[in-house]
Amino acid sequence: TQPQPEVPAYIFPLEDANAEVTNPYGWQAHPVTKQKSLHSGVDLAADYGTNVLAVADGTVLDCSYDAAYGYILTLEHENGIQTQYAHLSEFLVNAGAEVRQGQIIAKTGDSGWTTGPHLHLGVLIDGEAVDPLEALKSE
């Protein structure tokens, strides 16, 4: 029998794994308010209505609306890790649902304070925002 390929710990949240990072994690002037603040995630270029994928297995903690982030979905994963997907146009799962890595969970949009459609991906470890590109590197 053939050995099974190892499943990566995390996958990219968009089907286009080469999507451009249009706004990195870190302190910067907010593109809408112009005030300096921590950009607590990364913005990934995506057309309106692009499929958003769960980066890993988890439970949908919340699907809600926030004035700044617009429609935002939060997944809870193992080891105190949460992922947040913001500025969505549509939720495809409900709070409490179990999701699998790669499952389509939402559609990108431009809800909240944005300059256009994209996906804002945030990662929290034990409630603290960290750089998603570092935190979600597959080992």
Descriptions of predicted regions:
Residues S37-H39, A54-L92, P117-H118:
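Zn2+-dependent peptidoglycan hydrolase active-site motif and core
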Residues V21, Y71-E76, A97-E139:
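Conserved, short, structured surface segments that act as functional micro-motifs
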Residues N51-L61, V93-T108:
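Short, well-structured beta-strand-loop connectors
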Residues A46, E90-F91, A95:
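Active-site acidic-Proline motif in GNAT/NAT acetyltransferases
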Residues P24, C63-S64, F91, T108-S111:
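Residue-level recognition of beta-strand microenvironments
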Residues T50, N79-I81, E128:
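Short acidic/polar mixed-charge low-complexity motifs
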Residues Q2-Y69:
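Surface-exposed, glycine-biased beta-strand/turn segments
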Residues H30, Q84, V130-P132:
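Intrinsically disordered, low-complexity acidic/polar segments
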